[in-house]
């Protein structure tokens, strides 16, 4: 599925824009601060309900306006789908699909699987475990129909359990929460483990092409001890959890550990190599989705040329083209992306929030 049309109104520094898009490569060229990243962010927000540069809604809505409006048309193999998202300064959202209101942001996310590559995306590799959990959970969300509901219920139960830890004195008082929590935790952990095992070959193959000089390993850590039942872990750690006033073990502590030549990648790789690894992982994830479901990702790449030399840019471009996916690329200069362009591409110029093609 590709985004054939995008309407942006009062988003960041963009007053209004109506863009007819290519199903292949779309290039956004302009100086820093021109608004090219805002276009990428608008697409991301349309598919996620939130921006990737700021969680503060007031910074995303254009100055002195009350709300932003985003509309898109998605073209699939058999049908076209109209989608829309409006969000006001109070953070209230309205999702519209094919002319009807009352839909959830998760429905947009399912319709628009996308991969985001930005200069800030190094957190996937050198940030905390939550970023790598998000990587795994993206895959589980798009591969397991029941994942989102289970994950939402898990978050709710953990919040309730942590609140109860401030009041209870005996483990038996926690059993009502744990009775619901344990099967959810085990199911989510199983899905994550299966996903990490399934995508392992894709990650390995892509990383060997991007970083052949390193031996990279990936290991899923579920968040509690191996070969130990989660019920046993919760009961055994009750006193410690009560002192901490939060649940110290579980799927909310899971991680995907990534090592290069046996050492953490953040201690071994340069910034350019970290970007290559990040790109390799995002590509592997998108390609795995296509192979498993027949659905293609939409790729958003901000500041394409940063951290990469000509050879590595060429490698990334060729791999992106091979996916046959829709790709959006921002760059300061057209020279950085001209080699990627073909007769099906579209080149947009962005200046002070105005977009022309």
Swiss-Prot record:
One of its GO terms (biological process) is DNA replication. The keyword Cytoplasm applies. Pfam families: SMC_N (PF02463). GO terms for molecular function: ATP binding; single-stranded DNA binding. The gene is recF. ATP binds at residues 30-37. The lineage of its organism: Bacteria, Pseudomonadati, Pseudomonadota, Gammaproteobacteria, Enterobacterales. Belongs to the RecF family. GO terms for cellular component: cytoplasm. The RecF protein is involved in DNA metabolism; it is required for DNA replication and normal SOS inducibility. RecF binds preferentially to single-stranded, linear DNA. It also seems to bind ATP. It comes from the Bacteria. This is DNA replication and repair protein RecF. Keywords: ATP-binding, Cytoplasm, DNA damage, DNA repair, DNA replication, DNA-binding, Nucleotide-binding, SOS response. It is found in: Cytoplasm. The keyword Thylakoid does not apply.
């Amino acid at each position: 599925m590709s985004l054939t049309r995008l309407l942006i109104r009062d988003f960041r520094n963009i007053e209004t824009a109506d863009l007819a898009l290519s199903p292949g490569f779309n290039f956004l060229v302009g100086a820093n601060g021109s608004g090219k990243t805002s276009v990428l962010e608008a697409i991301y927000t349309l598919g996620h309900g939130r921006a990737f540069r700021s969680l503060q809604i007031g910074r995303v809505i254009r100055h002195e306006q009350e709300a932003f409006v985003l509309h898109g048309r998605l073209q699939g193999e058999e049908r076209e789908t109209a989608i829309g998202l409006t969000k006001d300064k109070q953070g209230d959202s309205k999702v519209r699909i094919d002319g009807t209101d009352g839909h959830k942001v998760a429905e947009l996310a399912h319709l628009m699987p996308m991969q985001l590559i930005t200069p800030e995306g190094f957190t996937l590799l050198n940030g905390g475990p939550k970023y790598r959990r998000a990587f795994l959970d993206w895959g589980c969300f798009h591969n397991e129909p029941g994942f989102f509901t289970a994950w939402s219920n898990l978050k709710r139960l953990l919040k309730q359990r942590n609140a109860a830890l401030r009041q209870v004195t005996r483990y038996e008082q926690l059993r009502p929460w744990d009775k619901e929590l344990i099967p959810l935790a085990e199911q989510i952990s199983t899905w994550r483990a299966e996903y990490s095992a399934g995508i392992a070959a894709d990650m390995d193959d892509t990383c060997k092409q991007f970083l052949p000089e390193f031996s990279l390993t990936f290991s899923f850590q579920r968040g509690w001890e191996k070969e130990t039942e989660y019920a046993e872990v919760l009961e055994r750690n009750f006193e410690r959890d009560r002192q901490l006033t939060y649940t110290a073990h579980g799927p909310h502590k899971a991680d995907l550990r990534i090592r290069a030549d046996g050492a953490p990648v953040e201690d071994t790789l340069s910034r350019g190599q970290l970007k290559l690894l990040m790109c390799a992982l995002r590509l592997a994830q998108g390609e795995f989705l296509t192979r498993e479901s027949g659905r293609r990702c939409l790729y958003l790449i901000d500041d394409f040329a940063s951290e990469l030399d000509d050879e590595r840019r060429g490698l990334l471009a060729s791999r992106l083209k091979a996916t046959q996916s829709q790709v959006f690329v921002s760059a300061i200069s057209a020279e950085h992306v001209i080699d990627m362009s073909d007769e099906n591409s579209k080149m947009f110029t962005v200046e002070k929030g105005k977009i022309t093609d």
